[in-house]
């Protein structure tokens, strides 16, 4: 992943690293992506928002920049950083807007966007009526004496600005680590929510004792302490039997572990961050959480989500269903997903997995790398950079062997097929992006072209006007899914049973339409690529129903003592 944190700090609104969501983690493609290309995307988005705020509120550009900063929270000095950015860049932006140039011209003039020699000009908006060269020369003349131009030409990077250095470092650490940064006893569980804390895996109930963590078998039936953090401990005074023994023995407790990519982590950029007609202080209340969770929302994901869904649909995550089935499973979840993950680097993710074969309960592991093996940052010939069936076979076998050495006996592993991404273009290409809704000037076709030109597209194979390329990408995805199916049918392992499920997106679309929804409503509005919260919960419902019908043993028994557990322990300490 090529320094995805840099784009996050051009301005606090530049928390739009579309690059971090998918193929940026191809470790065997060094140097193919330049971080300043992400900075260009961020600049164009933020400058567009500033311009639209001035339009909607009939205000000056200076007032709109200050309005944007006023919306941001104080936490992580986001508001302060924003005002400092206005102080540094504001005067030049005002001068340029006075000449009626658009965001593309502003960002090229300030050199956050640069046309590489021999490369096409990358732009989000239609080109000016005058020639681009003439327009850019006029704009550069306006700011040529600006001291800030010396900074942008130095190549020092936004993070060299003193007031942003701390933010940069924190975000960089958050993205780099797949285990909690705040973990006193180093047991891979935390009492802190973000920075890979309990939003990602069950909350620790004693961060000073590494023998206490979610998912372990109870120590002495937890008569004196809650060693597995499921909220069930102590002794029933009526008969002297430990509650854990009385309520959980023989109930087949198990955890849920996801090995996934940005879709599994629930990569999400709220549309209200870019839609000025909806923008307010409330729009950015969740910004600090999003920053420290890598713009992922695992706490609301389809596999390990535990918070109430904002989508207001009745479906729950796999974890919440397992917990409802057996309340002894409380807090036993791990979302080992990462933006950009694929079969090429999944084995390294397993190093952050927490499961002790002797001390812990079995687990259900879902392998769901649904796109990055066919999605990559190459602008030319992306097909040649896709994972081949032979490579996938080798990668997945290595992963399964690693899992076999980690998982307790009685576990289960489900291989999930790749996505059917042609749906994206077919559904979105003519629709307006949130940034284009005010003036009807930015469609998803324009967004896809802009990202593709900069070589930061999450998936150039599917987010492309080239029908042949989309078909080739879908063909390779199908080949890889078939490879996963063959592995599941032919391989056996000592400590787990192995299964395969298709990524049946059409079934989810049909279910959503029965509920009165439209297909485009299942895709993340800002990036135009990821399944959104509704889609993820519908996928969870689909997976649960299929597993329950085909392999009911995977889910374990329903615990008849659930009512008693709730009566004695309430919410079991919450999440």
From Swiss-Prot:
Q: Which cofactor does it need?
A: Ca(2+)
Q: Which residues form the Saposin B-type domain?
A: 36-117
The glycosylation sites are: 58, 206, 466
Residue positions annotated to bind Ca(2+) 3 are: 222, 226, 228, 230, 232, 244
Q: Where does this one sit in the cell?
A: Secreted; Cytoplasmic vesicle
Q: Which UniProt keywords apply?
A: Calcium, Cytoplasmic vesicle, Disulfide bond, Glycoprotein, Hydrolase, Lipid metabolism, Metal-binding, Secreted, Signal, Zymogen
Q: Which CDD domains does the record match to this protein?
A: acyloxyacyl_hydrolase_like
SMART domains attached to this UniProt entry: SapB (SM00741)
Listed binding positions for Ca(2+) 2 are 185, 187, 204, 206, 209, 212
Q: Which GO terms describe its molecular function?
A: acyloxyacyl hydrolase activity; calcium ion binding
One Pfam family name is Lipase_GDSL
Cofactor: record remark? Binds 3 Ca(2+) ions per subunit. The calcium ions probably have a structural role.
Gene Ontology cellular-component annotations: cytoplasmic vesicle; extracellular region
Propeptide ranges are: 26-34
- InterPro entries listed in its UniProt record: AOAH, AOAH_Saposin_N, GDSL, Saposin-like, SaposinB_dom, SGNH_hydro_sf
Q: Which reaction equations make up its catalytic activity?
A: a 3-(acyloxy)acyl derivative of bacterial toxin + H2O = a 3-hydroxyacyl derivative of bacterial toxin + a fatty acid + H(+)
Marked site: Interacts with lipopolysaccharide? 344, 378
Tell me, in a sentence or two, what this protein's role is.
Removes the secondary (acyloxyacyl-linked) fatty acyl chains from the lipid A region of bacterial lipopolysaccharides (LPS). By breaking down LPS, terminates the host response to bacterial infection and prevents prolonged and damaging inflammatory responses. In peritoneal macrophages, seems to be important for recovery from a state of immune tolerance following infection by Gram-negative bacteria.
**Protein name as annotated:** Acyloxyacyl hydrolase
* Provenance organism: Oryctolagus cuniculus
């Amino acid at each position: 992943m090529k320094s995805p944190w840099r784009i996050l700090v051009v301005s606090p609104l530049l928390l739009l690293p579309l690059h971090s969501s998918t193929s940026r983690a191809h470790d065997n493609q060094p140097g193919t992506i330049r971080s300043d290309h992400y900075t260009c995307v961020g600049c164009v988005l933020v400058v567009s928002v500033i311009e639209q705020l001035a339009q909607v509120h009939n205000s000056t550009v200076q007032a709109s920049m200050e309005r944007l900063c006023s919306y941001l929270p104080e936490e992580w000095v986001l508001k302060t950083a924003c005002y400092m950015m206005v102080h540094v860049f504001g005067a030049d932006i005002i001068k340029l807007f006075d000449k009626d140039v658009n965001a593309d011209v502003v960002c090229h003039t300030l050199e956050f966007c640069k046309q590489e020699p021999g490369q096409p000009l990358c732009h989000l908006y239609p080109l000016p009526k005058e020639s681009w060269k003439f327009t850019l020369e006029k704009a550069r003349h306006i700011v040529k004496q600006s001291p800030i131009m010396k900074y942008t030409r130095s190549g020092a990077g936004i993070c060299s600005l003193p007031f942003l250095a701390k933010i940069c470092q924190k975000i960089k650490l958050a993205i780099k680590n797949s285990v909690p940064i705040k973990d006193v006893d180093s047991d891979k569980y935390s009492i802190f929510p973000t920075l890979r804390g309990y939003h990602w895996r069950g909350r620790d109930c004693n961060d000073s004792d590494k023998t206490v963590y979610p998912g372990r078998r109870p120590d002495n039936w937890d008569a004196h302490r809650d060693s597995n953090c499921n909220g069930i401990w102590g002794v029933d005074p009526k008969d002297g039997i430990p509650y854990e023994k009385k309520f959980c023995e023989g109930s087949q407790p198990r955890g849920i572990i996801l090995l996934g990519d940005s879709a599994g982590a629930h990569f999400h950029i709220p549309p209200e961050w870019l839609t000025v007609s909806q923008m307010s202080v409330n729009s950015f209340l969740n910004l600090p959480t999003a920053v420290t969770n890598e713009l992922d929302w695992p706490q609301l994901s389809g596999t390990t989500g535990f918070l109430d869904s904002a989508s207001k649909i009745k479906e729950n995550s796999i974890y919440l269903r397992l917990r409802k089935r057996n309340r002894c499973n409380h807090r036993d979840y791990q979302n080992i997903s990462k933006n950009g993950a694929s079969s090429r680097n999944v084995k390294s993710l397993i190093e952050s997995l927490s499961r002790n074969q002797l001390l812990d309960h079995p687990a259900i592991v879902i392998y769901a790398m649904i796109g990055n093996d066919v999605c990559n940052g190459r602008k030319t010939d992306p097909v040649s950079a896709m994972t081949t069936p032979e490579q996938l076979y080798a990668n997945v076998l290595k992963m399964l062997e690693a899992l076999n050495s980690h998982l307790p006996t009685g576990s289960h592993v489900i291989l999930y097929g790749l996505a059917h991404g042609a749906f994206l273009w077919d559904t979105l290409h003519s629709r307006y992006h949130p940034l284009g809704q005010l003036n009807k000037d930015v469609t998803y076709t324009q967004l896809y072209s802009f990202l593709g030109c900069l070589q930061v597209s999450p998936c150039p194979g599917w987010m492309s006007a080239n029908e042949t390329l989309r078909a080739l990408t879908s063909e390779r995805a199908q080949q890889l899914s078939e490879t996963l199916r063959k592995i599941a049918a032919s391989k056996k392992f000592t400590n787990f049973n192995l299964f395969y499920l298709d990524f049946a997106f059409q079934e989810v679309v049909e279910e959503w339409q029965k509920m009165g929804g439209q297909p485009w409503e299942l895709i993340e509005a800002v990036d135009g690529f990821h399944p959104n919260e509704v889609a993820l919960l519908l996928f969870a419902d689909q997976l649960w129903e299929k597993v329950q019908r085909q392999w009911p043993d995977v889910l374990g028994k329903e615990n008849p003592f659930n009512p008693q557990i709730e009566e004695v322990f309430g919410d079991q300490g919450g999440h």
